[in-house]
Amino acid sequence: MQLEIQVALNFIISYLYNKLPRRRVNIFGEELERLLKQKYEGHWYPEKPYKGSGFRCIHVGEKVDPVIEQASKESGLDIDDVRGNLPQDLSVWIDPFEVSYQIGEKGPVKVLYVDDSNENGCELDKEIKNSFNPEAQVFMPISDPASSVSSSPSPPFGHSAAVSPTFMPRSTQPLTFTTATFAATKFGSTKMKNSGRSSKVARTSPISLGLNVNVNDLLKQKAISSSMHSLYGLGLGSQQQPQPQPQQPPSQPPPPPPPPQQQQQHQQQQQQQQQQQQQPQQQTSALSPNAKEFIFPNMQGQGSSTNGMFPGDSPLNLSPLQYSNAFNVFAAYGGLNEKSFVDGLNFSLNNIQYSNQQFQPVMAN
């Protein structure tokens, strides 16, 4: 009788776990077991298992069995909560060697426990043996008596009997990861990484887009432009400096020079131009060798366009330019006397030091 009562209790309280306070549900089971033992005293017939089956039946429906009501009061549970969590129209038959139940008036009768030694039990299907509550999926039956933690005692009979199923809450297994699976997850999360990130276009630098900008070339061009502006300012200054002074013409115009002297001046100019053309074109320069495309303004009065070209490899020799400008001035004023013109301007070529003269570079806005 103890074994059959324990099977029926496990089936009933399986509906109450996780819905009502667990401690009170356990007390409800203990009180119900005690009350059922008292009720079945003198009404247990192993020789005739089905005798008194209606008296031993536990019914929960519109009318609740008095044993269920008494156990609810002793455990502190509300009878409405117990009836609301149990199946509607539940009937449990506790008979010797067999425990069965029915849900609903027209529902099928299912067997929870049956003994192998019973002649009627041998005719039943083996799948019915040691069955448990199919509605309560959170409980697992333990068929091994050695590993059973149930408080159900051993069968009181000498022959072998089926062990009552013990129901235990199903514990959630922790997530386990291998090295490969954990590497594919986010740290601190069990969600997999989003593979859509790899489809995003990465930021590209200007070099990868074809905009190859060389900083050294920019610095060289900036230095060349500043030097060109300074040289251009020097050329203009050398041309504009002697111009304000000749505005004060002498009181008496000088007589025209004789023809032999004019011819001598033309010969000197031609010799000077030949010397300039014979000078080597490739010399060391402080400018960048890539600055060959810059053209200086024509600083000579009667020079070709090639004389205005300043080679990148030639040195910054300003002496030929300055002296050529001086001779061009004489060529423009061919009718003036050289001595009186120089004395009027107070212009001395020996006093000017071109190598030591410091110039202020002119920066263009």
Swiss-Prot record:
Motif (Bipartite nuclear localization signal): 22-39
Compositional bias (Low complexity): 144-160, 262-283
PTM annotation: Phosphorylated on Ser and Thr residues.
UniProt keyword annotations, A-Z: Cytoplasm, Nucleus, Phosphoprotein
Segments of this protein annotated with the region Required for interaction with CPEB3: 161-220
Compartment(s) of residence: Cytoplasm; Nucleus
Gene Ontology terms: cellular component: CCR4-NOT complex; cytoplasm; nucleus
Gene Ontology terms, MF aspect: receptor tyrosine kinase binding; SMAD binding; transcription corepressor activity
Short sequence motif Nuclear export signal: positions: 228-236
Residue span of region Disordered: 144-171, 233-287
Annotated spans, Important for nuclear localization: 82-92
Stored Pfam families: BTG
Residue ranges with Pro residues bias: 243-261
Membrane-spanning parts: none
Main localization (coarse): cytoplasm
PROSITE patterns assigned: BTG_1, BTG_2
Xref: InterPro entries: Anti_prolifrtn (IPR002087), BTG-like_sf (IPR036054), Tob1/2 (IPR015676)
SUPFAM superfamilies recorded: BTG domain-like
Positions carrying Phosphothreonine: 204
One GO BP: negative regulation of osteoblast differentiation
Similarity section: Belongs to the BTG family.
Role summary: Anti-proliferative protein; the function is mediated by association with deadenylase subunits of the CCR4-NOT complex. Mediates CPEB3-accelerated mRNA deadenylation by binding to CPEB3 and recruiting CNOT7 which leads to target mRNA deadenylation and decay.
Subunit structure: Interacts with ERBB2. Interacts with CNOT7. Interacts with CPEB3 (via C-terminal RNA-binding region); recruits CNOT7 to CPEB3 to form a ternary complex required for mRNA deadenylation and decay. Interacts with CNOT8. Interacts with CPEB4.
Name assigned to this protein: Protein Tob1
Organism of this sequence: Rattus norvegicus (Rat)
